[in-house]
């Protein structure tokens, strides 16, 4: 089976870091500072959302993640995205995931709130196992994975122009 890891970003609050630790899966953290990270294996990206809420989607994807994904080698290894957010921010809940999914043409696999629940951990572990099993069959089977949007506050994303 092909190698698969988790690549994630977590600010100094460490919310995403704590979630990733609960997964017990091989992981690499995108640095908070400007140090570059380059990956040479397939990965699932776990990313928090930094939008202000309402219709303000500006800044939803952390700058460090944008810098990481601006590297073509890093982009080509991404097999899917999982995002976190805060439902208090309404329409921008976990918005970084759909943005990255659309730009990279990879599946949005799951969204969770804040630190995630035990159910979120189990779902992400199952997604990881399923994707790892299917990675050798290339992108064709990755696209067949079911996208999960589990939070009742999640609404379809509106098109915003920048």
From Swiss-Prot:
GO biological process: protein modification process
Superkingdom per UniProt: Bacteria
GO MF term set: FMN binding
SUPFAM superfamilies, alphabetized: Flavoproteins (SSF52218)
Gene3D superfamilies per the UniProt record, alphabetical: 3.40.50.360
Function: Probably involved in ribonucleotide reductase function.
Similarity section: Belongs to the NrdI family.
Protein name as catalogued: Protein NrdI
Source taxonomy: Bacteria, Bacillati, Bacillota, Bacilli, Lactobacillales
């Amino acid at each position: 089976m092909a190698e698969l890891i988790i690549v994630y970003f977590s600010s100094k609050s460490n919310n995403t870091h704590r979630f990733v630790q609960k997964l017990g899966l091989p992981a690499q953290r995108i640095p908070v500072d400007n140090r570059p990270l380059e990956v040479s294996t397939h990965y699932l990206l776990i990313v928090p959302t930094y939008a202000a809420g309402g219709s303000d989607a500006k800044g939803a994807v952390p700058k460090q993640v944008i810098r990481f994904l601006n590297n073509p080698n890093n982009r080509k290894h991404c097999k899917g995205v999982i995002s976190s957010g805060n439902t208090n921010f309404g329409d921008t809940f976990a918005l970084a995931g759909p943005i990255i999914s659309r730009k990279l043409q990879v599946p949005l696999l799951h969204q969770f709130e804040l630190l995630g629940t035990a159910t979120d951990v189990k779902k992400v572990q199952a997604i990881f196992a399923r994707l790892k099993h299917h990675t050798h069959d290339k992108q064709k089977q990755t696209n067949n994975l079911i996208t999960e949007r589990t939070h009742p506050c999640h609404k379809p994303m509106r098109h915003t122009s920048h």
